[in-house]
Amino acid sequence: GDYPGQMFAAIAGTSMSSPQVAGIFALLKQAHPEWSPAAAKSALMTTAHQKVRDNDRVSMADPFDMGAGHVNPGGLWDKRGSIVQPGLVYEAGLFEYVALTCGQDWGIFTPGSCDFLEGLGIPSEAYNLNVASIGVGQLAGSQTVVRTVTSVADKGAKFRAKVEAPEGYDVTVTPNRF
């Protein structure tokens, strides 16, 4: 817009974060052209930091306010734990997204296609889409959620799962070391 008399204007929000994340994503794909879009997206999500303030700029944001957090392309680009070396990535491809639409009963694909994917063991439940975030709607009782990670770390790297469960929920990760 036009800001008469002003030489500078600070702009923030989703309209600015989208082009910034797109640029960071392009740099990440340049560093790892062999990574799928899902792997690159998971690298951005799992290396984001969660020290994000809410809209009031005083209280800390919760996951519903900030999503995965604040993407952090800076710092040591090649350091372990950076977006270029996240350690683990989550893969999801065409079959996983087609199975997701089957599970939503949108009628986009034929029942035969959906049966084929089910026969391959590809889950159709939205909460089992192999992405870096987990969301379970209408949770009553217990629910098993499955994620598969792919190591992009140096050979011999070891990992330990750590979960900060929402208040009132118990979360167990099996195995928790790999």
Where are the predicted features?
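Secreted peptidase-domain scaffold signal
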Residues: 62-178
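Hydrolase catalytic cores
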Residues: 1-61
